[in-house]
Amino acid sequence: MSASSPLSPTAGGPFAAWYAAFGDWARTDGAAWLYLFKALLAAFIALGVSMRLDLPAPKTAMTTVFIVMQRKAAPCSRKASTGSPARSSGSSRRSRSSGCSRSSRSCSCWRSPCGSRCAPPAPRATATSAVTASCSPAIRPR
């Protein structure tokens, strides 16, 4: 007679491999499929509500859902709403409106001037150099 019981975790069973494969899928592709399902569900709910309210352009509601549910917009809006003066070296109003954390210098928000990083402060004008914008090429004085 076997020393292990049929209910022991070492026995595995027919569903152990399926459970492990599902867990692996859920960590990789499952998040994307879940996001797609939520976006489509929200779009169809918005379409149904707009048709029920007899709005003139129901497609506008669906378009709005897809614009609002962009994945990259969420971290920027969260970062912009939680800016605190203690963390940033600039004023709290500027850090909240720009969505950038001045201390970390990382911002992938559409609000940042260069797109991928927060713009560094403009250099001070000296006799040998002109003040340049952070994303434009240097302007040489004549």
Swiss-Prot record:
Provenance organism? Burkholderia cepacia
Name any GO cellular component annotation: plasma membrane
- Give me the ranges of the annotated region Disordered: 73-142
Q: Which GO terms describe its molecular function?
A: transmembrane transporter activity
Pfam families associated with the record:
FUSC
Bias kind Low complexity: ranges: 81-142
Q: Which gene encodes it?
A: fusB
Q: What is this protein called?
A: Fusaric acid resistance protein FusB
Q: What does this protein do?
A: Involved in the resistance (detoxification) of the fungal toxin fusaric acid.
